[in-house]
Amino acid sequence: MEEGIHFARDGAIATATINRPDKRNALKMADLDALHRVMDEVEADKSIRTLILTGAGDRVFSAGVDLSDVGGGAAAWDDNPLRIVSDRLEALPRVTVARINGAVIGGAVELSLACDFRVGADSSKIMVPAAKIGLHYEPAGLRRAMGVMGLQAARRVYLLCETLEAMELHRVGYLDKFTTASELDAAVDAVASAASSGAPLSVDGMKRTLTELSRGVLDEKAARARIRESWASDDMREGLAAIQAGRKPDFKGR
């Protein structure tokens, strides 16, 4: 597998793997561009229902942005490429699952927080050394951290540079589930499969509403339109019929 972002799919589930294990899966600018292309493909293909994001190997999810690949000084980061990718990932109209296969460091924490779910191995840990190198993090990333982990845990991670490990990450809400390394793929697949089995109009629509609510920018009119669309959809009729017949529904996204 070549270095960079490797994209694969299995039915309704797609996986993007950060493949730079020799560099702790640190992200180059080209990798961030590649993640945009992945999201372009996922958005264009409605048969893809869930996107899994992970890192290659079994030690590190990602060490964040490769600082050796950063140039241009502070002004060049007014439009922070990592923040732009994370914002888009957060709003992607598909369910996203971060497969946490080890350490999540620096900006990779923000990337993982932009996913809807995080499922990790028991070796999972996060650490953000921003305060140790004099860096002020993006408000959008701090908002995501507060929303997922709560204010106090976010303070510990960003102000004290504490390393939080799997059990604590589960307690504060960062990890939805954690398990042994040998069972990680099965745990991730269970979440991805559950997400993929829901009615597309319902899942994608409610994800959009939840994202807007978390950002404090709900488009109430658009949300009401999505609700009306769901009530009138073939999928809702199919869902009710499936319940009555005691079978699995066959949703078409319409």
Segments predicted by a language model, with ranges:
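Glycine- (often His-adjacent) and acidic-residue-rich active-site loop
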Residues: 55-88
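Acidic, divalent-metal-coordinating active-site segment for phosphoryl/phosphodiester hydrolysis
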Residues: 162-168
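Glycine-rich beta-to-alpha active-site loop
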Residues: 88-137
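Well-ordered beta-strand positions
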Residues: 111, 117, 156, 160-162, ...
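Hydrophobic, secondary-structure "cap" segments at the distal end of domains
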Residues: 143-152
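Conserved CoA-thioester-binding segment of acyl-CoA-metabolizing enzymes
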Residues: 1-54
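C-terminal long alpha-helix characteristic of the crotonase
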Residues: 119-124, 175-221, 228, 251-254
